[in-house]
A protein has these predicted regions:
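Nucleotide/phosphate-binding catalytic cleft detector across ATP-hydrolyzing
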Residues: 1-10, 16-123
Length: 123
């Protein structure tokens, strides 16, 4: 069984696929979208940026479908958390059956710390 984790960050959107039995990293991909440029300058995602993000996440979801990955985690961090229109993004993604979890700053720090300490080859 495999699991996938998608990290939607300020500079890039990354996914990692792990073997759930031994947490060995199987695949990694990074796409620079620079979401922070919109959010930190204008307070929200521009519609063009949001559409690029939605299309990318749909592409990732399609990849996970082809690889028969059932356990998928789409995680939004700082840029999504700080965006004034993150609720619209969540709604649009829900319409595509993509469940986005937006982490608080404290949750993000705690999760990344434990993830990097507990799972080999996760950095």
């Amino acid at each position: 069984m495999k699991i996938s984790i998608v990290d939607i960050g300020s500079n890039a959107v990354k996914y990692k696929i792990f073997d759930a039995n031994n947490f060995q990293l199987i695949e990694y991909y990074r796409e620079p979208l620079r979401l922070g440029r919109d959010v930190f300058n204008g307070g929200k995602l521009l519609s063009s940026t949001m559409n690029r993000l939605i299309n990318l996440l749909q592409d990732y979801s399609d990849i996970f479908n082809r690889k028969q990955i059932v356990h998928r985690y789409f995680i939004g961090t700082s840029a999504i958390r700080d965006s004034k229109n993150s609720d619209l993004l969540v709604k649009k993604l829900n319409n595509k059956n993509i469940n986005l979890k937006i982490l608080s700053g404290k949750q993000e720090a705690s999760l990344l710390k434990s993830f990097n300490e507990d799972i080999p080859n996760s950095a």
